[in-house]
A protein has these predicted regions:
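A cross-kingdom signal targeting lumenal/periplasmic-facing segments of multi-pass membrane
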Residues: 254-321
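The feature marks short-to-medium sequence segments in extracytoplasmic or secretory-pathway proteins
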Residues: 80-132, 137
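C-terminal motif of bacterial Sec signal peptides marking the signal peptidase cleavage site
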Residues: 17-19
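Terminal, regulation- and interaction-focused segments at domain boundaries
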Residues: 212-242
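Short, solvent-exposed beta-strand/turn "edge" segments of beta-rich domains on protein surfaces
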Residues: 57-74, 81-84, 130-132, 220-221
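Low-complexity, acidic Ser/Thr/Pro/Gly-rich terminal tails and inter-domain linkers that flank the onset
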Residues: 27-67, 209-210
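Surface-exposed edge beta-strand/loop patches
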Residues: 21, 28, 34, 95, ...
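Short, hydrophobic/aromatic beta-strand segments
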Residues: 83-91, 152-154, 240-244
Length: 321
């Protein structure tokens, strides 16, 4: 009987403790994410955008939103036109979470007051739809989580105009395979003793393509593999957004954590969007960039491997893949 009483007392204490859980988000200005915001101005509308990291989201919302696969995207819009504009949150993510949906997904058991505060806080900090003439508004769109990089489209509409801004954010905290190259001039890294040839005509480009290897190889070049069937001509700031916009994800660097996670998904199924992929070789090195697009299962995914070629076309970089 005495043990039973102890159990009841402990249970009541636990319920009391959980019921006293307070909602204590860090003030937004103290989190520091706005320092990373990027800005664009077009047709009288200025947009500032930043994608919060897992740590910033936890501080700003007192909850591990990334664990719930929710990623807050902060947006500030300044309307310097003479007409009211309308912001469309689904331009950021067609499947974005409504503020009260986020509060419901992150609610705490036996913490009614804290949950009410969450609902109010998430709603008050969401991005307004209306952008009055001559004013600035800001807030969050609660998007689905993306790691490594995110393409953000911000669209606003008025009676006489439609304005859109495109941003590409590399999100800190994710180690992608291409991070192994470091910073600096990639041509000097990949071709330190080779002159980069600039192709001036389509004929020169066609001839160069015909001279390229037909397939990838293994590390020592003794076996061939997948065909090389793609040539991309474009600046990185144009190519990278195009792939993110089309649903391609960066690939995690090969490491113990990513390998274990891949194994778990391989056994139990499900889609691991960032699974590391094997190395294939062109120009004597493994892929410079690896991207992938997964289906509903890790066993069904498309891989894209790209190598920076030792040529340019009228000064524009060339990638082969």
């Amino acid at each position: 009987m005495r043990d039973a009483r102890k159990f009841v007392v402990l249970g009541m204490a636990l319920v009391s403790f959980l019921g006293c859980r307070t909602f204590s988000p860090t003030p937004m200005d103290e989190v520091g994410f706005k320092e990373r915001a990027e800005s664009q101005t077009e047709d009288g509308i200025t947009a500032r955008v930043v994608v919060l990291t897992a740590e910033e989201a936890k501080a700003a919302f007192d909850c591990k939103l990334y664990k719930k696969k929710i990623q807050p995207v902060w947006i500030e819009l300044t309307n310097e036109t003479d007409e009211e504009m309308l912001f469309i949150p689904r331009s950021v993510d067609p499947d974005y979470f409504a503020p009260l949906e986020v509060a419901q997904k992150t609610s705490w058991t036996w913490s009614k007051q804290a949950n009410l505060e969450k609902k109010r806080y998430y709603y008050e900090n969401s991005m307004p739809f209306l952008l009055p003439a001559g004013e600035t508004v800001s807030g969050f769109v609660y998007a689905n989580r993306s790691l490594g990089g995110r393409w953000v489209l911000v669209e606003v509409f008025g009676r006489t105009r439609k304005v859109h801004h495109e941003f590409v954010h590399e999100i800190p905290g994710f180690k992608a395979d291409f991070h192994r190259h470091g910073e600096g001039d990639v041509y000097s890294q990949f071709y330190p003793d080779q002159e980069i040839v600039d192709l001036a005509t389509e004929e020169e480009l066609r001839k160069w393509i015909e001279e390229q290897p037909a397939t990838v190889t293994n590390a020592d070049g003794t076996k061939t593999g997948d065909p090389l069937n793609l040539v991309i001509i474009g600046e990185p700031e144009a190519v990278w957004p195009a792939f993110l916009r089309s649903g391609w994800d960066p690939t995690a660097a090969m490491g113990a954590g990513s390998v274990v996670k891949t194994g778990i998904f391989g056994i139990f199924g499900g889609a691991y969007r960032y699974a590391p992929i094997s190395n294939l070789y062109v120009y004597g090195r493994s892929q410079d960039i690896a991207l992938q697009k997964v289906r509903s299962n890790i066993h069904y995914r498309n891989h894209l491997r790209l190598w920076l070629a030792p040529v340019t076309v009228k000064g524009i970089p060339v990638l082969i893949g």
